[in-house]
A protein has these predicted regions:
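Non-catalytic, usually N-terminal nucleic-acid engagement modules in DNA/RNA processing proteins
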Residues: 2-216, 445-483, 496, 501-515, ...
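Glycine-rich phosphate/ribose-binding loops and adjacent secondary-structure elements
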Residues: 2-3, 30, 214-374
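A short, charged/proline- and glycine-enriched loop
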Residues: 34, 219-221, 484-490
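A cross-family glycoside hydrolase active-site/sugar-binding cleft signature
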Residues: 37-40, 73-79, 136-140, 178-179, ...
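A structural motif corresponding to the C-terminal end of an alpha-helix
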Residues: 122-133, 163, 167-176, 203-223, ...
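Gly/Ser/Thr/Ala-enriched C-terminal appendages of enzymes
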Residues: 321-442, 563
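A polyanion-binding, active-site-adjacent surface
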Residues: 487-490, 494-574, 578-581
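Glycine/proline-rich loop-helix segments at beta-alpha junctions forming the active-site rim
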Residues: 556-646
Length: 646
């Protein structure tokens, strides 16, 4: 399907609360109603074409295109660096835009078998009619967050805005985003923050000017200009500066909007995320009496329980890859009617039955309802091989189980979007958001987001409950526990006062600074020893209050023993092990446990002092980032450090 790229956004309705309904028009006749959630997927997962390679992604793409006819995806264009090693492979992809590659996947029979990987695949005997898809091509700036040395020069492209636009154009982007530099969740002085923001701001202006120069039938995508801030004030200031510069540019190109970045590293702090988004949308509404207020607004990486609140603030589009990550962890999000808590409650695949899938009734559950028992057996088998599984008439590969769970989880997200649209149409979204926050099981986090969005204070019970009856034997890792597949980097962190640990500012900062999906965080509790991130919300972990001190020698020995036991039991699951600890008591535990196990890297390597204030020092966080960039390349460094400590 050859087509012109000419994408526009039209605001159809805006409620008193600020929530909006709109339409994105793309291609020849394509339409997408907003608010909309773009599934973030990887497309270039090896040699062409669209339905070939990529483990679970190939099944997701095949089902969502050939069966669902889903018409909007986001992909971060630099993801090819994770799957390809040569310029030649990339050049093969760039011969055609993504729309053409997708059209070829829709054909039936044995045409282009090599390109589409159809040999031996059960569902390619039928042809499906091609249709238009809206491809949102993100610049890939998030890769720069954890690796400032990232480069695509070996593929023939300098890492600069001009190259990014060239790639987005060749790939056929209907929506494109400017090359940006996300802000890690660290403490910035004003000068450093503005310098980082200005790099993104200048790239946004460059992109707008570059597309404004296009003429005739040259592609005219909808442009999202990236905006960044670390709180309300800095987000508001950045947005206002960007708008003033756009005014001075005097460009005539009108198909642009604003994409809010740097939210993913802060997403566990829902109130902060809402404040940052409000800073952006307030600045847009205030500038020149709302001159740009009909432009679309995107929130990068936001989905799930935050969507209702952010829609109320005026966000039109979202994207998410969390449905894939939840699926890879073999988790199934329960439909809202199956729980009185929130849409975030999950079950493991082992807990599912045909009745569970039948009650859900989503497209994924309908497709795989008869295969749930074989899939439960399949996840225990070897990866990357086809298996004959009892109960299935055809061979199965483990990636299909991941794909099924991922697509079901995405369907739950889509249902929430549709519910939000209905509430906007009825002018009842504000009440819905408050009810949603109050019934959520997120321990007040969504209440804080609602308060940040509206300025209203919501009464709620005092503080976090602490149990005085918990002992060090109140929590243990179950014998059935296994570290999640695909996470082959172990990162040990010290515990925090705030629970769950992932909600603590210190943990948020480190998780944001090392967003590699392969990192498995295990927290060293001063009371319990190792606590894997999947078990952080166990009641015994949420409600204890104990800080390990160097003087508690017997407890220090017990915690050390438990951490050592964890390493000996599960250490072979990881290709790289590191402990990032600055406090003296927890550093003693980490050092002794790593030494007893025989490998692992203790960071920071030489802190100025052994106190918690060193935890977020820029130099120390940067050392951690560098250590995790290439775990295998760090092997000699690990061995050297251990040898020195013996």
């Amino acid at each position: 399907m050859s087509r012109n790229v000419n994408t526009t956004f039209t605001l159809e309705k805006e409620s008193a609360s600020g929530a909006r309904l709109g339409t994105i028009q793309f291609g020849e006749r394509g339409k997408l109603q907003t608010p909309a959630l773009f599934p973030a997927i990887c497309i270039m997962t090896g040699p062409p074409g669209f339905g070939r390679q990529g483990s679970h992604y190939k099944y997701i793409k095949r089902a969502m295109c050939r069966d669902w006819r889903h018409n909007h995806f986001l992909t971060e264009i630099l993801h090819f660096t994770d799957y390809m090693a040569t310029k030649r492979s990339l050049d093969c992809w760039l011969k055609k835009p993504f729309q053409t590659w997708m059209d070829e996947m829709m054909r039936g029979g044995n045409v282009d078998t090599l390109d589409q990987g159809r040999m031996g695949d059960f569902d390619y005997e039928r042809a499906e009619k091609p249709y238009e898809n809206c491809f949102f091509l993100d610049s890939g700036g998030f890769k720069l967050l954890s690796n400032s040395d990232f480069s695509i020069e070996k593929f023939g492209y300098p890492t600069e805005p001009k190259s990014i636009l060239e790639l987005q154009t060749k790939m056929g982007g209907d929506i494109i985003a400017s090359l940006d530099y996300p802000l890690a969740p660290l403490a910035y002085d004003t000068k450093s923050l503005v310098q980082l923001q200005n790099k993104s701001l200048e790239n946004a202006l460059w992109l707008l000017k570059a597309v404004d120069k296009r003429k005739g039938k040259e592609p005219k995508p909808l442009i999202y200009l990236a905006v960044h801030g670390v709180d309300y004030e800095t987000a508001h200031d950045y947005t206002d500066r960007l708008l003033q510069k756009i005014d001075r540019l005097g460009t005539k190109y009108s198909a642009f909007g604003f994409a809010i970045g740097s939210l993913v590293p802060r997403r566990t702090n829902r109130g902060l995320v809402a404040s940052i988004v409000k800073g952006v949308t307030d600045a847009i509404r205030e500038h020149r009496n709302g001159f740009y207020s009909q432009k679309p607004v995107h929130a990068f990486g936001m989905s799930g329980d935050l969507i209702p609140t952010l829609v109320m603030l005026g966000v039109d589009t979202f994207d998410t890859n969390s449905f894939v990550q939840t699926g890879k962890n073999l988790k199934y999000i329960l439909p809202a009617r199956a729980t009185d808590k929130s849409v975030r409650e999950t079950r493991s695949i082992d807990e599912l039955s045909a009745d569970t899938l039948r009650m859900c009734g989503c497209r994924a559950c309908k497709s795989y309802g008869s295969l749930i028992e074989p899939l439960k057996r399949l996840v225990r088998l070897e990866r990357d091989k086809r298996h004959q599984v009892e109960g299935s008439a055809r061979d199965l590969i483990k990636s299909e189980a991941y794909a099924f769970l991922s697509m079901h989880n995405l369907e739950i997200e889509f249902r929430e979007i549709e519910r939000v649209k209905a509430e906007i149409a009825k002018n009842t979204l504000n009440r819905y958001v408050l009810d949603y926050a109050q019934r959520s099981n997120n321990r007040g986090n969504l209440i804080r987001a609602y308060e940040a969005a509206t300025g209203q204070i919501v009464p709620r019970p005092d503080g976090r409950r602490v149990s005085l009856n918990l002992t060090r034997d109140s929590f243990t890792i179950p014998d059935s526990y296994r570290p999640p597949e695909g996470k082959d980097i172990l990162l040990l962190l010290p515990c925090s006062k705030d629970k769950p640990y992932k909600s603590a500012r210190s943990h948020q900062a480190i998780r944001g600074a090392v967003p590699d999906l392969r990192v498995h965080v295990v927290t060293i509790s001063g009371l319990y020893g190792p606590v894997p991130e999947e078990l952080e919300e166990q009641p015994e972990v949420l409600f204890y209050d104990y800080v390990l001190s160097p003087e508690a020698k017997e407890q220090t020995e017990e915690v050390t023993r438990r951490v050592t036991d964890y390493l000996r039991r599960y250490g072979t699951n990881y290709k790289f092990i590191a402990a990032y600890v600055t406090g003296r008591a927890y550093r003693i535990v980490a050092k002794r446990a790593l030494k007893a196990y025989g490998k692992g890297l203790l960071l920071p390597s030489d802190p100025k002092e052994q106190t918690s204030k060193e935890f977020l020092r820029y130099e120390n966080v940067r050392e951690l980032q560098q250590a995790l960039l290439s775990p295998i390349a760090q092997k000699h460094r690990q061995d050297a450090q251990l040898a020195l400590s013996m």
